[in-house]
Swiss-Prot record:
GO MF term (any one): DNA binding
Organism this protein belongs to: Drosophila melanogaster
Subunit and partners: Component of the CPC complex.
Positions of modified residues (Phosphoserine): 152, 163, 205, 218, 220, 244
Protein name (Swiss-Prot/TrEMBL): Borealin
InterPro entries: Borealin_C (IPR046466), Cell_div_borealin (IPR018867)
Known tissue expression: Ubiquitously expressed in the early embryo. Expression is restricted to the ventral nerve cord and brain during later embryonic stages.
Phosphothreonine modifications at: 146, 209
């Protein structure tokens, strides 16, 4: 009777595998949940940041730079912020920046708010909006995340950092796209910057040949057909179609021969006249039908060569 008792080692291994699978599924679920929480956090932070940027864009530059005591004194003098007048120097700088942008062909910024009362401060608000918007972006990049349970859980795993690069790209996107030169497309690799080796002729190979040269040489090369293969001479290097060196069989002697593969070896025919009793019948029994058909085709080719050579000699 075969023993049906399960070994303890296999049972223990199966339990360990089950525990690892459960832990892996739990980690996958936690990762998906953390990703969803991060997406919600990013969504709400971007909404709040957008509202703050909108408010900062509506406030004039001098008004935004005021300190708290000055703001309190300003509340006593003004009924609303739209009545605040910028100084003459600020208006001059704003008008110069607006005229410079108009000469360069850039449209002036239209992010500033339209006050209920149109006064002389509208021209100065256009130049101050971009500066306030840029300052708010830079201040938002320096904000630190509030530590909490989510932050400690994320610290256990290597995740993508939420750096300031994503927000700073908005600043760079306002610049006009620069026209890249033709030299950037062909970049020098590290090997080209090193000391060059001695120049040598590189053979064409299947792994080094460019695609265009492969297509040019994809056709049949100018080599004779398979019935007229030539063995390399002693000391001659045999190359493949694409120039790779090959290990080829070298003829030891300079004479014609015919090699016939049989089941237990190769039957080599030398240019020597054979008698009928020299041909062993047990060797011919090892020939299969395909090899016999190949020998017949080879016999016809040899007979054709003999006839052509005889006609060429007698002419």
């Amino acid at each position: 009777m075969p023993r049906t008792k399960i070994p303890k080692n296999s049972k223990r291994n199966r339990e360990v595998a089950n525990r690892e699978e459960k832990v892996r599924l739990y980690e996958l679920k936690m990762d998906s949940r953390l990703i969803s929480i991060d997406s919600l956090e990013t969504k709400f932070l971007s909404a709040v940041d957008h509202q703050v940027k909108t408010l900062l864009g509506q406030v004039q530059k001098e008004l935004a730079n005021l300190k708290m005591p000055e703001v309190l004194r300003l509340f006593e003098e003004l009924d609303r912020f739209s009545d605040f007048k910028a100084s003459d120097q600020t208006q001059l700088l704003a008008s110069m920046s607006m005229s410079g942008s108009a000469i360069e062909g850039h449209a002036p910024s239209a992010t500033g708010s339209r006050n209920d009362e149109e006064d002389s401060s509208i021209g100065a608000s256009g130049g101050s909006i971009l500066a306030a918007h840029t300052g708010s972006l830079l201040r938002s990049t320096k904000a630190m995340r509030t530590p909490g349970p989510l932050h400690s859980a994320r610290a256990r795993r290597a995740r993508r950092s939420r750096s300031a690069c994503g927000d700073l790209n908005i600043l760079h996107s306002a610049k006009p796209p620069s026209i890249s030169s033709s030299s950037s497309s062909s970049r020098n690799s590290r090997s080209k910057l090193r000391t060059p080796m001695a120049s040598r002729a590189k053979a064409f190979s299947a792994d080094r040949t460019p695609l265009k040269q492969k297509q040019m040489r994809s056709g049949s090369p100018t080599t004779p057909p398979m019935a007229f293969l030539r063995y390399p001479k002693p000391g001659e290097v045999a190359l493949s179609k694409y120039g790779s060196p090959m290990v080829a069989q070298v003829m030891p002697d300079k004479f014609a021969n015919v090699n016939i593969p049989i089941r237990n070896g190769v039957l080599s025919l030398r240019p020597k006249k054979l008698d009928a009793d020299e041909v062993e019948s047990n060797l011919l029994e090892n020939l299969d039908e395909d090899t016999l058909n190949q020998i017949k085709t080879l016999h016809e080719n040899l007979q054709m060569i003999v006839n052509k050579a005889s006609q060429a000699v007698f002419k």
